[in-house]
């Protein structure tokens, strides 16, 4: 009986250790490769910060001048290349769309 309990305890300890060591990848899954957003009428701008880091921004102007532009900051598991459908939705509604890629994500 003690042998079975020991094996279960060892397996549980191994599972806990694996979860602890891989917690950053479990909580903050990063994309494998940054995908450049492709959308008609969109502008992808590359800005180099004073620190030397590169930041990208996606701008889709509104259909009519003077219309509202939505500023969007994506979540941890997203990147600019995945925001094209969202940008299209706002564009169809007559709104502009502006999003910035966080340093270390996607294209940056």
Which residue stretches match the model-derived regions?
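An N-terminal hydrophobic leader/cap segment in hydrolases
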Residues: 4, 8-48
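Membrane-embedded segments
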Residues: 50-108
């Amino acid at each position: 009986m003690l042998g079975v309990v020991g094996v279960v305890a060892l397996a549980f300890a191994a599972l806990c250790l694996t979860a602890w060591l891989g917690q950053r990848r479990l909580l903050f899954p990063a994309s494998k490769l940054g995908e450049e957003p492709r959308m008609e009428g969109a502008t992808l701008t590359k800005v180099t910060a004073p620190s030397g880091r590169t930041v990208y921004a996606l701008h889709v102007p509104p259909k009519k001048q003077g219309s509202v532009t939505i500023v969007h900051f994506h979540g941890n598991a997203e990147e600019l290349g995945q925001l094209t459908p969202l940008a299209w939705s706002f564009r169809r509604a007559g709104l502009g769309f502006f999003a910035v890629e966080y340093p270390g994500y996607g294209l940056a």
